[in-house]
Structures are given as C-alpha cells and as structure tokens.
Swiss-Prot record:
SUPFAM superfamilies: Creatinase/aminopeptidase
Pfam family membership, one: Peptidase_M24
Catalyzed reactions per annotation: Release of N-terminal amino acids, preferentially methionine, from peptides and arylamides
UniProt function note: Removes the N-terminal methionine from nascent proteins. The N-terminal methionine is often cleaved when the second residue in the primary sequence is small and uncharged (Met-Ala-, Cys, Gly, Pro, Ser, Thr, or Val). Requires deformylation of the N(alpha)-formylated initiator methionine before it can be hydrolyzed.
Record's protein name: Methionine aminopeptidase B
Binding site for a divalent metal cation 1: 120, 131, 258
Phylogenetic classification of the source organism: Bacteria, Bacillati, Cyanobacteriota, Cyanophyceae, Synechococcales
E.C. designation(s): 3.4.11.18
The family this protein is said to belong to: Belongs to the peptidase M24A family. Methionine aminopeptidase type 1 subfamily.
GO biological processes: proteolysis
Length: 274
C-alpha cells in the first residue's frame, strides 16, 4: 500500500500515519521480513490464476483472505483507518485501468477483457509486514496497455538496481523517471514508496522521480518499498469520494509494480521476489 508524499499539496491530511525516525533492521528482523515478503509474493502468484474476464474484485479479495488465514497471516489493510479516513474495507487493493491505487474490492466490479488490474497486498506475519503489488493483463489488452505495464515493471527494476550503500534516494527516482519518460509515460508524484518493518509505513519516503545525488544516503539495514505508478497521460490525480480510491485526472490508464527491498552491505536484496 502506497504512502502519500508529504510534500504533496493534493490533500491536507497526511496519508497514512507513520512511525518516526529512521529504522535499521537487524539480521534477526530481516529473517522475519524475508518470510513475510515471500508469503506476500506467493499470494500474488496464487491470485494471478483468477485474473480473467468475469471475475469480481470481491472474489479476488475473498480468496486472498482465505489464503492468508490458511498461511497464518493477516491483512494489514483491512480496517486500516488513518485519522480522517474511513476504515479500508478490503483485505487487498484492486485497482483497474484508470485507478492508480487503493481501489476497494467490490462484488459489482467485474473484470472485463482488455482491462489491466493492479493487485496490492500487504501481509502481517509475526509482527512484520510484507508489501508487494503487480499489474496483470486481463485477456487481450491494447498495445498501449501492454507497453505501459511492461514499462512500469522495468522502471521499478531500474530503480532497484540503483540501491546500494552510499547511493542516494534521488538516484532511485531519477532512474525510474528517466526510463518512464523515455517510454512515453508520466510518473505519479503524489504517491511514494515507504519504509516498512514492524509498521506498515515508517518515516522513510522513496519518491519515484527526482535528481541523482539528492536525498538521504542509503545505509545497510534500511528496508523500504519501491513502487512506481506510471500513467498513460498526465501524472495528476483525483481522489474519489470514498476517501481511498485514486484515479488519473484525465481518466487514462495507470499501472504499478512494487517490491519490498533491503539495503545490504553488497547492494540490495528484494524481499518479495516470487
């Protein structure tokens, strides 16, 4: 689940609340993060087979709930209610086509041929969180939709490739932005990656745009998400009346991919690889 950029003026409320201070995780804590991260990745693998025309987003949500229970985990998003926001009613986020993020599962929302859908899962297991998302193609999609989805995944991986001790947070965003814009797409500014561990969101913010050499210097033990959202058109957003759903201002397509990563002595480890 995304973190709203504190520098954004889109809304007055900070979304969501965060713990204070930079968090560096120990080797023991990282073992727990690996376990929950792998579980989150496995959940997306499981749900992928259900992504087809005629399936409701509520059905995806219900299956995710059952699967988490079977594996001893719980959803970190279900009932999540930052100050000023209604409780989130989904165990997962399901964001279709122009929905950028935080789409709420609904029995009346049925997948159609040609859709793209991002499924974002945040699990809690043994007190730690695993957060990952992928955008899936539903049936036969347009060339533009396919290009957008592929560019979004590649931009995420290019950002992750920048991560190592001594690198700057801005290096991640600069790599993502350069690839996205060269591919003809825009990068969402108002939603950013975030620190994660015992809390779903910590103080650390990871913008998916920016300048090389800027921002906080990366250190071993830092754990955070890299989760770019690329839009077919403008990067500007609109927040719907439900208090959660975010869509593109021009109603054009949006895609997102997300991994949870840790800075290691040698570089980076992806904790949510399938």
């Amino acid at each position: 689940m995304n973190h709203q950029n504190l520098l954004s003026i889109t809304r007055n409320l900070v979304h969501p609340p965060i713990s204070s201070g930079l968090v560096l995780l120990s080797a023991r804590e990282l073992d727990k993060m690996r376990r929950v991260g792998q579980l989150a990745a496995n959940l997306l693998n499981h749900l992928e087979s259900m992504v087809q025309p005629g399936v409701s987003t509520q059905a995806l949500n219900d299956e995710a709930t059952r699967w988490m229970e079977d594996h001893g985990a719980i959803s970190a998003t279900l009932g999540y209610a930052p100050p000023g926001y209604p409780p989130f009613t989904g165990a997962i986020c399901t964001s279709i086509n122009e929905v950028v993020c935080h789409g709420i599962p609904n029995p009346k929302q049925i997948l159609k041929d040609g859709d793209i859908i991002n499924i974002d899962v945040t699990l809690r297991l043994a007190g730690y969180h695993g957060d990952t998302s992928r955008t899936f193609l539903v049936g036969s999609v347009s060339a533009t939709a396919r290009k957008l989805v592929e560019a979004t995944q590649e931009s995420m991986m290019r950002g992750i490739a920048e991560i190592k001790p001594g690198a700057r947070i801005g290096d991640i965003g600069a790599a993502i932005q350069a690839y996205a814009e060269a591919s003809g797409f825009s990068v969402v500014r108002d939603m950013v990656g975030h620190g994660i561990g015992r809390q779903m969101h910590t103080e650390l913010q990871i913008p998916h745009y920016g300048k090389r050499g800027s921002g906080l210097k990366l250190r071993p033990g830092m754990v955070f998400t890299v989760e770019p959202m690329l839009n077919e058109g403008t990067y500007e957003l609109t927040f719907l009346a439900d208090g959660w759903t975010v869509i593109t201002k021009d109603k054009k397509l949006s895609a997102q991919f997300e991994h949870t990563v840790v800075v290691t002595e040698e570089g980076v480890e992806i904790l949510t690889l399938a």
